[in-house]
Amino acid sequence: MYTLARQLLFKLSPETSHDLSLDLIGAGGRLGLNGLLCKQPAALPVSVMGLNFANPVGLAAGLDKNGAAIDGFAQLGFGFVEIGTVTPRPQPGNPKPRLFRIPEATAIINRMGFNNLGVDNLLARVRASKYSGVLGINIGKNFDTPVERAQDDYLICLEKVYNDASYITVNVSSPNTPGLRSLQFGDSLKQLLDALAERREQLAVSNGKRVPLAIKIAPDMSDEETALVAAALMESGMDAVIATNTTLGREGVEGLPFGGEAGGLSGAPVLEKSTHTVKVLAGELGGKLPIIAAGGITEGRHAAEKIAAGASLVQIYSGFIYKGPALIREAVDAIAAMPR
């Protein structure tokens, strides 16, 4: 059924198709239809960050930026749902067109630019949701906030979403907000992590619960840079790392229609680079910090490869666009079939 739906959706512009799909998934969730229309994955519970996941396959941030279809995505069989990236204030993002399909490579290029309705709008939708599973909220900075003041935006979002999130992801790796990726390095990273850790401990005391913090990183760092990030995450007391965001590289899409568009590349071409980052992180972290792997999962076996590389959980986005809900089940089955 999804194959037919995709054929129809792919006749529309990518962003129109995205918005329509979100509306349909959201409506199906409100009516309780999605679980009836989609075969559910087998139960494969796992505990990570002190949280209990129904299965290790989640929705990556970016697909549902405003929390418009939380119930709908959960009913499709995801073991957890991550929404956002959300910023303190609403912002329109970059000019259109800003989303490009490259079906020949099972890939997508986007330069959306954190378009979202703001953190208060997102929280209203979260509180209206009936979903009781693991919900991640991905936070970022506003486009017009100077990078040297980025910490302020992250702290605003952290405080606002704290009581409504199962875990919180700090996005310092989108390539579509100028200067953002500089926060992954050196003193900038240390200062941000220390500020987040300090505020989180204050919130844990005042709210009576400690919400895990994850950092989402890029796949374009050298092994040495990745190792430095791993050390900083452990030193600051972060709870997880998400590897990875989109890549600025164009391997696998050179010469293809839209392959030269600016923005972050996701989908099949980023698989190898992203999984390599997982392996490097696993070697550096030594099991002290869980890894959530995202990037390039377009077949069930790719999810198993991420787990074998050292990840505890996986997330999908572009693969879901191309393969539909069946990919969730395939990924869960592939992980379940791994030797114990």
Swiss-Prot record:
This is Dihydroorotate dehydrogenase (quinone). It is found in: Cell membrane. Belongs to the dihydroorotate dehydrogenase family. Type 2 subfamily. HAMAP family: DHO_dh_type2. Substrate binds at K65, N110, R111, M112, G113, F114, N171, N176, N245, T246. The active site is at S174. NCBIfam families: PRK05286.1-1, PRK05286.1-2, PRK05286.1-4, PRK05286.2-5, pyrD_sub2. Keywords: Cell membrane, Flavoprotein, FMN, Membrane, Oxidoreductase, Pyrimidine biosynthesis. It comes from Pseudomonas entomophila (strain L48). The gene is pyrD. Its EC number is 1.3.5.2. Pfam families: DHO_dh. It is a peripheral membrane protein.
